[in-house]
């Protein structure tokens, strides 16, 4: 677990950047941290890049760092004089990458699969400037779900509705997730999808 001082946070505030992301949760997380930034969608085909990387047989755990870099670079090319931040998160369960559910039926199946078991959440972040990557990081956390029955899963999904589909793990730890989570080992913000503390530490060292 990484700890961060008030001084580092204060130095990070006011450093402007562009978040290369369509993720509402990452946007909300960084806004809640008091950071100054704008948002731009990545100009890249994430699924195509992911497929190519996996064909090259890269270590699955490094996938978020690679995808974060591609997202940041795609926006940096159009904004070469600004800091651009990209990020990506994956779940690995039983050595396989778990993709986002597209329907509530798929979400139900996924929660049933994860029930009572551990899985790894790996987030990567990349900062680019002048079309070049100047910083990157990868963090891993382990999440364990409670043993949940089919009835509990149905009740949970009824409460969350389709908004749960925006969460890779289908539990949204920042909302109703604690109802079905047993434990989190590692950085909490990493589970939310962004390695916040290391990023704040980096940002505090950037000259305005």
Residues covered by each model-derived region:
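GST superfamily/GST-like fold recognition
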Residues: 12-35, 107, 117, 140-208
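Generic enzyme active-site microenvironment
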Residues: 86
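Acidic low-complexity segments
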Residues: 132-140
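Active-site-adjacent loop/tail segments of enzyme domains
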Residues: 89-119, 145-147
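Short beta-strand-to-turn element immediately C-terminal to the catalytic PLP-Schiff-base lysine
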Residues: 92, 128, 183
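Anionic-ligand binding region
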Residues: 124-125, 132
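N-terminal polybasic phosphate/anion-binding patch
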Residues: 6-83, 96, 151, 155, ...
């Amino acid at each position: 677990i990484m700890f961060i001082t008030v001084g580092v946070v204060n130095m990070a505030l006011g450093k402007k950047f562009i978040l290369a992301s369509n993720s509402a949760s990452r946007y909300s997380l960084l806004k809640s941290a008091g950071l100054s930034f704008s948002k731009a969608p990545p100009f890249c085909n994430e699924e195509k890049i992911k497929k190519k990387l996996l064909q090259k047989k890269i270590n699955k755990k490094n996938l978020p760092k690679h995808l974060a870099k591609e997202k940041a670079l795609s926006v940096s090319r159009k904004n070469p004089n600004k800091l651009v931040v990209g990020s990506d998160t994956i779940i690995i369960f039983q050595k396989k990458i778990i993709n986002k559910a597209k329907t509530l039926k798929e979400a139900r199946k996924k929660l049933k699969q994860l029930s009572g078991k551990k899985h790894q959440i790996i987030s990567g972040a990349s900062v680019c400037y002048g079309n070049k990557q100047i910083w990157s990081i990868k963090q891993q956390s382990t999440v364990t779900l409670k043993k949940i029955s089919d009835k509990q899963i149905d009740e949970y999904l009824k409460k969350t509705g389709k908004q749960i589909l925006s969460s890779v793990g289908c539990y949204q730890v920042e909302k109703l997730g604690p109802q079905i989570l047993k434990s989190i080992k590692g950085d909490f913000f990493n589970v939310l999808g962004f390695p916040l503390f290391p990023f704040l530490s980096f940002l505090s060292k950037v000259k305005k």
